[in-house]
């Protein structure tokens, strides 16, 4: 039986989703809701898009990037609520739900991080990693979702495969 893993790099504008089967990367998608300027509309749209992606991929295991404390409380609430939407999907579909800290997944795949490494540099590293490993030219949201998947597989083996 196949083991399906979905990894999510969520944000309030664009979220990357990656799909792995039996420990092998299969595909990714970008959920873009940046056209919605109102945060409540954006949340509803992003929630529905993530729900549809989960329905399509039918994962056994989900890893979503843990929300980190931000200066923007509105964005923090958005991401925390979005995590709840993913958790609810998992509960309703007998799917294992997990979060992973950005520092953990970056460390697992050998990314340089620390006080002197800026956010944009971290995103560039993710894009470069995916280009070098998979030959894919993707944006940072998709890249980070793929990186999260690779890190999970490296940290925990083939997660049920």
Task: Label each residue range with its predicted role.
Residues 1-161:
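Phosphate- and other anionic-substrate recognition elements at nucleic-acid/protein interfaces
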């Amino acid at each position: 039986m196949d083991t399906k893993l979905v990894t999510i790099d969520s944000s309030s504008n664009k979220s990357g989703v990656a799909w792995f089967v039996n420990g092998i990367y299969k595909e990714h998608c970008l959920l873009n809701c940046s056209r919605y300027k109102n945060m409540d509309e954006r949340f509803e749209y992003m929630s529905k898009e993530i729900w549809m992606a989960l329905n399509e991929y039918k994962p056994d295991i989900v890893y979503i990037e843990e929300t980190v404390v931000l200066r923007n409380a509105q964005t923090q609430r958005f991401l925390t609520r979005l995590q709840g939407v993913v958790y609810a999907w998992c509960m309703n579909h007998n799917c294992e739900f997990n979060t992973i800290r950005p520092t953990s997944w970056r460390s697992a795949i050998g990314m340089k991080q620390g006080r002197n490494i800026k956010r944009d540099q971290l995103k560039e590293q993710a894009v470069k990693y995916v280009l070098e490993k998979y030959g894919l030219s993707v944006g940072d949201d998709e890249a980070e979702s793929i990186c999260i998947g690779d890190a999970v597989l490296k940290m925990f083996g083939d997660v049920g495969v």
